[in-house]
């Protein structure tokens, strides 16, 4: 009977996290937002494209890591562990606010919601629950969250409205965002609602709780490796099917973070982690030392080991390249990004040029992260 070591466990999570972060850099840094291949676009409203998997996958792996990081429920250590959880959450939220402030330089129009803000909030809620609730209650707590969120979303119209609208800016979540944060502090491109708003943040807690479920299977010391992998695949298939069926009545929607979206994306996350665990088991069983998982997927693993660094760094550099300008020989003022991107014009295909620019971003960060990995330098919060 083969048991899994923490090293293998961390390896699989780093790989899944790394592929997610690499995907995030690819979709967030096109040469031009006007020329993007369809799979690299978010769904306009309802639906779920490959790009719409990035954020829920990241929240899922946050949950999957909790059973390994928040490992003690001994009353002597709970207060100390919870203090660390609070510090980490506050740090993530503050970094997220700084990223929103960078380049805008305006407190009066500072966007309060954001990706890191949601990660910090959800991590704080889920890790705190993991400390105080019994394990069985933790593993099913995502169910009442989705039930209540769905009921409020489809049954309660915003004040002043007589019926429920699940359209941009017209749902109850958008009303909550406007009244909690104020329109000046929402995403400037949507203005009256925010894709990382408060109400959708509640249902995203369920995504991370499902990640905890997966992490609990992986960290179990009672089951052998094959049974754990079969359990992960089984739950993954079940969740994907339920999500697809639920989509018929409540469409998948990232901005609303609907229940069908939560279930479907969590199912795909289960299947992805199950695949990496199975591949790792297969390679070790056949003793293909030259084909170790670390070697095959090294480009993705380095992204997973320094996820926060690359997320923050890529955001800051992308904003800086748009802010800094240079003067051309004809006197025209353009951003550094536009200057670099224009060097790809010889290709003659706007979509391909935009994609190659994004790939250069990915390559740039892979080189940096590979150097840091060789030196064992990892930025953790």
Question: Which residues does each predicted region cover?
Answer:
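Alpha-helical transmembrane segments and their immediate juxtamembrane cytosolic regions
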Residues: 1-381
